[in-house]
């Protein structure tokens, strides 16, 4: 794994709370009254390996908008003070997946969302975050070179839940925004006087000209969490609103990806006796 730039000012708090590998277990002042120790991930971008899933975590820097993982040379805006080291890492991680013939689910996780919903009326809540097309171009370029594409992309940042399906070539890829895990206030996707936002809704403004993007579902009312299930043949992502409590665990939204075909399918639940 490529080492992070630990001198970057934007990383100091994150490193102190999440990147403490090699240190004894300890709580940081940021934990407040929580009985939780600092995490031990190796850096601000990383590969997390598990039997049926490989997660590539990217660091999209500390701007409110946009998310940035490179200098974005030759594009507007560009960021000459940001290293391209994450592109080196991402290319190497994807090529390793190809070389090792990893057959499980490949997830890319990045804080800033590549997509956020666009209302056809043009009326949106003023605090709504923007999509990050240039960041997605960087990810796409690395995937194209390696010949490896993610089965899903997970993000946060926007304080609500949104799910999109991107169709490109024969691949159907869920893009999930889960930014309503507890940070208040929840951000509404429509402003005062806007018509009801109904899904599914095509999002032509999010297309790069080679794909199609559909806004599938959302929750801008509740806090919630994701449950991600992977097995040798499928990846299932569930959204659960916190208002359901501990006794109701049927998801309000879900999507399943066939790992071999990259198509959205009906989930084949494992037998209770298996």
Per-region residue spans from a language model:
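Extended active-site neighborhood of metal-dependent phosphoesterases/phosphodiesterases
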Residues: 1-101, 125-134, 138-152, 160-215, ...
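Short, well-ordered beta-to-alpha junction loops that form the rim of enzyme active sites
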Residues: 59-60, 109-113, 156-158, 240-242
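Gram-negative outer-membrane beta-barrel proteins
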Residues: 66, 116-120, 245
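Short acidic, glycine-rich surface-loop motifs adjacent to enzyme active sites
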Residues: 97-119
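Hydrophobic "anchor" residues on beta-strands that sit immediately upstream
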Residues: 107, 152-153
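A short hydrophobic beta-strand element
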Residues: 108-110, 176, 235-239
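Residues that line or immediately flank small-molecule/substrate-binding pockets and catalytic motifs
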Residues: 157, 179, 232
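A short C-terminal boundary segment appended to hydrolase-like catalytic domains
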Residues: 202-274
């Amino acid at each position: 794994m490529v080492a992070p730039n630990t001198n970057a000012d934007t990383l100091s708090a994150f490193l102190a709370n999440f990147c403490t590998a090699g240190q004894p277990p300890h709580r940081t002042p940021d934990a407040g009254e929580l009985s939780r120790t600092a995490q031990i991930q190796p850096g601000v971008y990383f590969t997390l390996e598990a039997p049926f899933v490989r997660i590539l975590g990217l660091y999209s820097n500390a701007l409110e908008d946009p998310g940035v993982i490179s200098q974005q040379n030759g594009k507007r805006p560009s960021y000459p003070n940001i290293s391209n080291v994450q592109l080196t890492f991402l290319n190497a991680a994807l090529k390793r997946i190809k070389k090792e013939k990893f057959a499980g689910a490949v997830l890319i996780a990045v804080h800033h969302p590549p997509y956020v919903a666009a209302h056809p009326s043009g009326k949106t809540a003023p605090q709504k975050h923007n999509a990050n097309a240039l960041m997605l171009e960087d990810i796409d370029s690395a995937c194209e070179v390696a010949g490896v594409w993610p089965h899903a992309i997970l993000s946060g940042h926007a304080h609500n839940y949104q799910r999109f399906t991107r169709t490109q070539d024969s691949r159907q890829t869920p893009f999930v925004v889960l930014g309503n895990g507890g940070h208040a206030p929840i951000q509404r996707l429509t402003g005062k006087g806007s018509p009801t936002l109904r899904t599914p809704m095509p999002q032509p403004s999010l297309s790069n000209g080679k794909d199609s993007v559909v806004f599938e579902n959302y929750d801008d009312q509740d806090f919630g969490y994701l449950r991600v299930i992977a097995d040798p043949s499928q990846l299932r992502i569930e959204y659960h609103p916190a208002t359901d409590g501990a006794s109701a665990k049927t998801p309000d939204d879900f999507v399943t990806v066939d790992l071999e075909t990259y198509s959205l399918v009906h989930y084949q639940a494992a037998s209770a006796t298996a």
